[in-house]
A protein has these predicted regions:
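Extracellular/periplasmic catalytic domains that process cell-envelope and extracellular macromolecules
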Residues: 1-4, 39, 63-66, 107, ...
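Short structural boundary motif marking the start of a folded domain
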Residues: 4-8, 308
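Acidic Gly/Asp/Thr-rich repetitive segments characteristic of extracellular carbohydrate-active
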Residues: 10-48, 54
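Right-handed parallel beta-helix/beta-spiral solenoid domain characteristic of secreted/periplasmic
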Residues: 12, 28, 46, 63-141, ...
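Acidic, glycine- and Ser/Thr-rich low-complexity intrinsically disordered tracts
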Residues: 18, 25, 90-92, 189, ...
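Short, T/G/N/S-enriched strand-turn elements that build extracellular solenoid repeat scaffolds
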Residues: 32-38, 53-63, 84-85, 273
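Extracellular beta-strand/beta-solenoid scaffold signature
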Residues: 57-60, 90-115, 138-158, 180-203, ...
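Right-handed parallel beta-helix
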Residues: 69, 76-78, 120-131, 160-176, ...
Length: 433
């Protein structure tokens, strides 16, 4: 006998927690009723459009299946429902081991407006999410041990490989997370993999099937969108990365498309530890806005006052196409694109403009087999190309529209190797800047 799927309705204006929540006329009144449920395959949670859930959060429990996924979305007419968590929804994150640098924080409390913890086969769509805190001084905002915050946090831990997680048409804004913590679930949309309680029993925690599309993320700290920092990071050391390593320890079928990230405190969009991730048709604007001395004041032993816009970390054959990056703020990096410590990164058909740290960096000794082709850079600053200790890179068939005083190779990052071939360089006139 097949189970009947359930739909739960929640309304901040017309609901009541004494209701059964199974029809719009008998909607729950708060998200707390959903947090107490274990969802089953095919179940839906729908929030009424026009609802505002103040000082509330949504932490989903349960799993869908390949044929019957869970859905979190909206119903009715009007504006998308809003979740303003305001520092609620606190959970404890622990990678279970130090990260790839001893300065990186790897455990602590996190506030997440929406948390998917060991959840798979799920679609989240049509929500507005914030997670802000009041502050009156920059000392408060930049406090070194301020709690990490997320708009949407996704965690893999005790479920082995998590499949088919889709986040679509969600607005995440005003997330006042920790200025310094790069690898906690800290920012707009952030996905991680933590050490399982019993890895032999449950399997390696990883993702296969992540889609983030048509999302808007703005005024968040620290990251805009990040997919996949993992407790298995040590498996990815070295130069040429093996595909089987990703299929066992990393992530597969990662897509980030049609998203807009603006005014992130640090980096805008980053797939991590992923095999052939696709990042396309995204826009990043005015990011890395907190990577400066006026905000980044109290890092203590943490380094990391660096950020770029759209880039991969420790990926194999990552592809970036039809993206646009403008006005990334100057820091040690500050460029639009960065092929960072990965194997076979391809940037093609992208556009960059007025990024204070330049257009493209090839970062460090483990950045190999990377190609930057058929892109357009217009009025990027600081130095267009940054070959930073990388063994090789091919830059070909691009258009670089430059100010006369801006160097093609960034002076502080010229220790690597880059091959320039068939690029078009045009000097911008004063009235064209």
């Amino acid at each position: 006998m097949s189970r009947k799927f359930k739909t739960y309705y929640v309304s901040s204006t017309n609901g009541d927690d004494c209701n059964n929540g199974e029809a719009p006329e008998t909607a729950f009144g708060s998200l707390g009723r959903i947090n107490n449920l274990e969802l089953n395959p095919g179940d839906r949670v729908l929030l009424e459009r026009g609802s505002v859930f103040e000082n509330q959060y949504l932490h989903i429990k349960g799993r869908g299946t390949g044929s019957d996924r869970i859905e979190i979305g909206a119903y009715g007419e009007g504006t998308m429902p809003c979740i303003h968590s305001n520092g609620t929804g606190i959970w404890y994150q622990d990678y279970g081991a130090p990260l790839d640098s001893p300065s990186h924080v790897y455990k602590g409390e996190v506030s997440s407006a929406l948390l998917l913890y060991d959840v798979e086969y799920i679609l989240v769509h049509d929500l507005i999410i914030t997670n802000s805190s009041p502050y009156t001084t920059m000392e408060e905002y930049a406090a070194p041990h301020k709690m990490d915050r997320t708009g949407i946090a996704v965690v893999a831990k005790n479920g082995g490989t998590l499949h088919d997680i889709t986040i679509r048409n969600v607005w995440v804004h005003d997330v006042t997370g920790n200025v310094y913590n790069k690898h906690m679930n800290n920012g707009g949309i952030y996905m991680t993999a933590l050490t399982p309680d019993n890895e032999e029993k449950t399997g390696i925690a990883r993702y296969d099937g992540i889609t983030i599309e048509n999302c808007t993320v703005w005024r968040v700290s620290r990251w805009g969108i990040a997919v996949g920092y993992t407790y298995q990071h040590q498996k990815f050391s070295g130069v040429e990365l093996d595909e089987e390593t990703f299929r066992k320890y990393g992530h597969e079928n990662v897509i980030i498309r049609n998203c807009y990230v603006s005014r992130a405190g640090g980096d805008a969009i980053t797939p991590m530890y992923s095999l052939e991730p696709l990042t396309e048709h995204n826009i990043a604007d005015s990011c890395a806005k907190e990577m400066n001395d006026s905000v980044y004041r109290y890092p203590e032993d943490r380094m990391g006052k660096v950020a770029a816009a759209i880039w991969p970390w420790k990926c194999k054959n990552a592809r970036f196409c039809y993206n646009e990056v403008t006005d990334t703020r100057l820091n040690q990096d500050g460029m639009a694109y960065d092929a960072d410590s990965g194997d076979g990164t391809l940037y093609e058909y992208n556009y960059s403009r007025s990024n204070e740290g330049g257009c493209i960096m090839f970062c460090m000794e483990e950045a190999v087999h990377n190609i930057f082709r058929k892109n357009i850079s217009y009025d990027d600053l600081g130095g267009i190309i940054s070959p930073a200790c990388n063994p090789d890179a091919l830059v070909t068939e691009n258009e670089f529209h430059m100010r006369r005083e801006v160097p093609l190779i960034r002076e502080s990052m010229q220790d690597g190797t880059v091959t320039l071939k068939n690029n078009k360089i045009t000097i911008i006139k004063e009235d064209e800047k």
